[in-house]
Amino acid sequence: MKTNGEEDSRHIFRGELALVIAVMINSLAVILMLYSGSGISAISSVPYAFEKVFPVITLGTWTYIFQALLILSLMILRKKFVPIYLCSFFVGFAFSELLDVNEAWINVLPKTIPLRVLYFVISYLLICVGIALSNRCGLPIIPTDLFPRELSEIIKVKYSKIKVSFDVICLGTTACMTGLILGHIKGLGIGTILAAFTMGKGIAITG
């Protein structure tokens, strides 16, 4: 007969495994979507814009700087220090490092038009699955996934609405930054826009 301790240990292990898989899936999906030529995913569009404007720092580094600001914003909204948010930042750091790892090898993939479409579809589905896994694992998750979930709880608005709004704001910021500073919009494509307006519901269906 299983004890409560054994059941708790199994639950924690499953949560940890789900989180590891989610981080690996999301980091690959973000780079794959960008490689497809359809644009960067909304959750990484702001760090991507900073990388293009200030290329001395990698996408991964800009990502955890952005994530730190999201964590700080949540603590300000909560009006207190939340230890689990700090844990989330360390998970985000691992995600950021994996972005740079995946960016280093992704060019080995062939880049025909049919394959680009396939890469986008795969990356879209992977992000939906990855975020749904993160939300259900019961452990600290990547700050870009944590932010809309926590904001939804703080201001009492449905998660899917917050997620779509967050993505659209990220895309608007990216468009303004690259358009005004570089003279042309970088990183935003039809896939980015489609994902931003539908991914909230996609995650809800997947989760």
Regions found by a protein language model. Give the residues of each.
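Core subunits and conserved enzymes of cellular information-processing
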Residues: 2-207
